[in-house]
Every structure is written in structure tokens, then in C-alpha cells.
């Protein structure tokens, strides 16, 4: 089966290509009775939208969402919700020079080997443009989780390339284009990105996502554990090369006496588990960390081959994010929310 749908009860099927007429998704399984209009979804899409600062792609897409079905008089009906986002600023001619070559680090090679052909325009189906419908679906999940369980999902950037970003305040996160929780470091980030653009290169990032106010009990052992599903969908995001939960890889250097979160009558002491034990939520915040690789489309020439196997030099022109991690925070939030609503509904179905 093709891998375009996620979820068991709250299912999201994503469709479209970067330079096609439109992209979108169908959300099947949303409970009826949720007050919902386009503005609820648009607010999240605007956080991810391209062209909002000099540090991201200058492709100018309004990303205006259209609700085609599943909502009547401002309320979800329980039937499939179809969401459409039209592409209005595609420049396919920018990709004519790489239509027959494979960009190092990109999915050009693997899509061709799997399907026997590929759409080279903007990366086609493998483009990060396809995360917009994910954010749209995630907006619905966020709203339902907040209204029915008081769950809050939010994220921030904790590292840009070699620059670590110490956490200071959630209030700083929406006040800068990096989603950095530290206003004092923003000038350094801007200077770094300005030089990176002059170099024609790209860089990676680290994103943290936190879900608060979850009840204990969500998750379906053994194979649909909450943390397993989180890791699964996060690795489905463009450019994600690593996922850790709680202490993550830091647990390697910890002893059991340190890693295991002690329990008192007042609750857990620490959260090395990242809010999940045995694949089931503990009631503590669920904490997820993502490693985002550097963007593959850069102006620096690199060696590759064309579809005939002949050696070529590749240089990617056009408009690209020099750090895709800058816009990854709302995308990662959406993915976490989609996993959580699915598990909330599954828990309710089995355990009441």
C-alpha cells in the first residue's frame, strides 16, 4: 500500500505535488460537533507559510485553505473533511537544469528508482511543500485536543547549525522568524543565516516539541506504542534524520538510578521518560526532539550523475530554504497533535 495516509481512527490522507495545481488532504474520523472554520486552520498555516522572512524560501504562497466538505454551519459533521490549498507561485523553469540529474541528498534518485520516473518541478511529491496539508490537518487536531482534554502542543528551535539556543521563555518563540525561545540570540542567528545565503549553502537544525496536560493512559502496546507512533510520523517529515523522546540518546551515559524518574505521592520527579513509559502516556509532558538535515537544494556545485549514469556537476537554482528547520516547528507540532488525537480516540474506544 502507498504511504500517504496516517492514523487509525483519525486518518489523514495527503495529496498533491509542489508545482501541481493544488495540494491538500482528506481528514477522515474527526468527531462531529467541533466548531471549525477556515480561520482556525489558516492561523496555523500562516505560521508555516513561505516568504515570511529573508531567511526562508522567497516563494510567495498565500496558502489559503479551502474547506470543501465535512463542515456544516461552522461545525464538523463527522464525515470526511477535505482541505485544499492552491499553488499560485510555482516557477517550474527553475528546475529545467536538473530535470535529468540527481541532487545529492535529495529524493530524486530514489523516486526514480522506485517509480521509474519523477516530477522534477520543485521536488514534486517529495517537496516540503506537502507539509502544508499536514499543518492544516494538525490545526483540527490541536483544536479538538485543547477543547476536550486541555492538551497544548507547542515547539521551538533549540539549535541552528552550530549555534545552540538556550531556552529562556515561551514568550520569545512567536516573536522571531526562527521560533527561538531566546530573543537575545536572534541577531547571531540572523548574521549566521545571512552569511549562509551568501555562501549559497544550507544548514541543519534541532527542533523541540512539547505536549502538555495529557492524561495518563494513551498508547497501544505493543506495536502502536505512543512513542513508537510519534517516532514513526516524525521520521515521515521531510529532512528529519533523527527523533528522540525525553532524555533520548542522553540516556546512554545515564545510570538507572539517574534515568528512572522517581515517583512520589505528588507525582514524578524528573521526566527522562519524556512523558511515555511502556508506550503509554504518564501524564507528564511529552517531549520530542528532532534533527533536521541541511536542505539538499543549494547553489554550491557538487558531483552527481544523470539518469544515464554519466557524471555531472549539480547546482540548484530557484528559491529554497537555506535551513528548512526554520519553518519546521509548526509542522512538527502538527504531527505530534495528529498522533495524540488518534491515540485519544483509540483509548476512548477501548477503555471508555
From Swiss-Prot:
GO cellular component, one term: cytosol
Cofactor names: FMNH2
Residues annotated to bind NADP(+): 48, 54
Catalyzed reactions: 5-O-(1-carboxyvinyl)-3-phosphoshikimate = chorismate + phosphate
Enzyme's top EC category: lyase
Cofactor annotation remark: Reduced FMN (FMNH(2)).
List of residues binding FMN: 125-127, 238-239, 278, 293-297, 319
Top-rank taxon, per record: Bacteria
Pathway this chain belongs to: Metabolic intermediate biosynthesis; chorismate biosynthesis; chorismate from D-erythrose 4-phosphate and phosphoenolpyruvate: step 7/7
GO MF annotation terms: chorismate synthase activity; FMN binding
Described function: This reaction introduces a second double bond into the aromatic ring system.
Protein family (similarity comment): Belongs to the chorismate synthase family.
Protein name per its UniProtKB record: Chorismate synthase
Originating species: Bordetella petrii (strain ATCC BAA-461 / DSM 12804 / CCUG 43448)
